[in-house]
């Protein structure tokens, strides 16, 4: 029984250390790890880091940057990648339509 408890305790410690060491994977706390104070063009990791609430990965191998949300007629991406950022484009800004076939369109 003592061996089992030791194994469970060690497993929990290793699990916690693994989660703490990898901030790319997992859920982001509400409000993000930092306040949304980054301007468009500044590097970000998650949407919550940006004043615009949109962090975009434009190309693989390039850093994510803050960007404006899309306006009517502009390219958009309604989906979000796990971890809290967008691929290629931001979603539509409030009042600028719905992202249909990757373009913000008023309905």
Curated annotation (Swiss-Prot):
According to its UniProt entry, one GO biological process term is: digestion
Q: Which GO terms describe its cellular component?
A: extracellular region
What does the PTM comment state? Contains 5 disulfide bonds.
Would the keyword RNA-binding be found if you checked this record's keyword annotation?
Answer: no
Q: Return one GO MF term.
A: toxin activity
**Which organs or tissues contain this protein?**
Expressed by the venom gland.
Q: Does the keyword Cytoplasm apply?
A: no
Q: What is its main location?
A: secreted
* Protein family according to the UniProt entry: Belongs to the scoloptoxin-18 family.
Recorded superkingdom: Eukaryota
Subcellular location per UniProt equals: Secreted
Protein name as annotated: U-scoloptoxin(18)-Er1a
**Signal sequence interval, chain numbering:** 1-21
Entry keywords, A to Z: Disulfide bond, Secreted, Signal, Toxin
